[in-house]
Amino acid sequence: FLSLIPHAISAISAIAHHL
């Protein structure tokens, strides 16, 4: 589960940067 946390943060960061 801990491995999914940084992946989720990375995805959110990528989306925020795209916006």
Swiss-Prot record:
UniProt record similarity statement: Belongs to the frog skin active peptide (FSAP) family. Phylloseptin subfamily.
Subcellular location: Secreted
Biological process according to GO: defense response
Keywords per UniProt: Amidation, Amphibian defense peptide, Antimicrobial, Secreted
Name of the featured protein: Phylloseptin-J5
Coiled coil, from the record: none
Tissue specificity: Expressed by the skin glands.
GO CC field: extracellular region
Role summary: Has antimicrobial activity.
Modified residues (Leucine amide): L19
